[in-house]
Swiss-Prot record:
InterPro entries assigned: Elong-fact-P_C, NA-bd_OB-fold, Rib_uL2_dom2, Transl_elong_fac_P/YeiP, Transl_elong_KOW-like, Transl_elong_P/YeiP_cen, Transl_elong_P/YeiP_CS, Transl_elongation_fac_P
Provenance organism: Synechococcus sp. (strain JA-3-3Ab)
Subcellular location: Cytoplasm
Key words, A-Z: Cytoplasm, Elongation factor, Protein biosynthesis
One Pfam family it belongs to: EFP
Function: Involved in peptide bond synthesis. Stimulates efficient translation and peptide-bond synthesis on native or reconstituted 70S ribosomes in vitro. Probably functions indirectly by altering the affinity of the ribosome for aminoacyl-tRNA, thus increasing their reactivity as acceptors for peptidyl transferase.
GO biological process, one term: peptide biosynthetic process
Recorded metabolic or biological pathway in which this protein acts: Protein biosynthesis; polypeptide chain elongation
The protein's name: Elongation factor P
Family in the record: Belongs to the elongation factor P family.
């Protein structure tokens, strides 16, 4: 059990039989009445975001989420095959189970698979990945003075905005949480 006073971003709780992850929280102490905690929660099964309010000190059941380190091996049709780093067991996951993480998956990449009651609910990518630019418009001389950006397609199929000086074949570092360019490799 977790007290509502201990809720922080990233903490997992179980509400109405479903796992939720705290995205935002605000502890409110009104002039009159009891204090309460206003939260924004993400359902880890469906991805829906809901706002809930709890009384200060209210006890909530903790969601027991198992984190397993796995390595992405290859894709086979609509399935993506991962290998457990400890037991070497292989597990196929569908694109629906992986969600938006699929656009950054590269062979031999290590990821964390989150399970709740034996069911895969999320794939955690590394915060940054290094990928090669396979398609982008050529930069024109003198373009960098404005600090503009242009779209670029990466080797995994993901599309991000990159600075104008980036060329096809260059390796760029990308933040997987915000889908933004960080720098050249």
């Amino acid at each position: 059990m977790i007290s509502s006073n201990d809720l922080r971003p990233g903490v997992s709780v179980e509400i109405d039989g479903a796992p939720y992850k705290v995205i935002e929280f605000l502890h409110v102490k009104p002039g009159k009445g009891a204090a309460f905690v206003r939260t924004k929660l993400k359902n880890m099964q469906t991805g829906n975001v809901v706002e809930k309010t709890f009384r200060a000190g209210e006890m909530l059941p903790a969601a027991t989420i198992e984190k397993v380190n796995m390595q992405y091996l290859y894709s086979e049709g609509d399935n993506f095959v991962f290998m457990d780093m400890e037991t070497y067991e292989q597990a196929p996951l569908s694109a629906a189970q992986i969600g938006s993480a699929v656009k950054y998956l590269k062979e031999n990449m290590e990821v964390a698979i989150l399970r709740w009651k034996g069911q895969v609910i999320d794939v955690e990518l590394p915060n940054t990945v290094v990928l090669e630019v396979v398609e982008t418009d050529p930069g024109v001389r003198g373009d960098t003075a404005t600090g503009g950006t242009k779209p670029a397609k990466l080797e995994t199929g993901a599309e991000i905005q990159v600075p104008l000086f980036i060329k096809v074949g260059e390796r760029v570092r990308v933040d997987t949480r915000t889908d933004t360019y960080i720098g050249r490799e």
